[in-house]
Amino acid sequence: MNFKYKVLKFKKNKFENTDDLISIEEPLEISLRYKNQNKWLNNSLIITMRTPGHDKDLVRGFLYNEQIIQNINEIDNIESFGDKVGKYNIQNKILVTLNNSKNINIAKIKRDFMTNSSCGVCGKSSLDALEITKKEKTLNSDPKLTKEIISQSPSILRNNQSEFSKTGGINASGLFSTDGTLIT
């Protein structure tokens, strides 16, 4: 899911207002509705980060990969639920109902799934366990980086993360001092 944002870009030694295409990420809570000893139960499995748009495919793949299902026909229904939240008005919860031929012992399949992100969202078991607070910070002074330092920083980063040019899948950020030295 992509959105256009108005941004200020630095090009050819000057700033210009332009549109930029941004991919968004949102947390997704995956819950399971299943039978155990002929009783229907609901259980929250995991939270992961995703780019909204193909949530049902993501969930099917997750359940298959984790061997919760062995066949797509074991899923009776997948539905989004909960409030539409955030700037993009998105439902961030999915309930998967397994068909009644699948009798599950959740204790055998529930574990701490390995989904990680540096922001701390992935790996939580429910959205209720995740408290997101947004604190806006106002700068009290003008930026202290010169145009030259800003324009040199992408090439400095590229030189220090060689795997990105090979794979396109590993990227990083950098922290620079005000004189343009890459700190980390």
Indicate residue ranges for each PLM-predicted region.
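Intrinsically disordered, low-complexity regions enriched in acidic/Ser/Thr/Pro/Gln residues
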Residues: 1-173, 178, 183-184
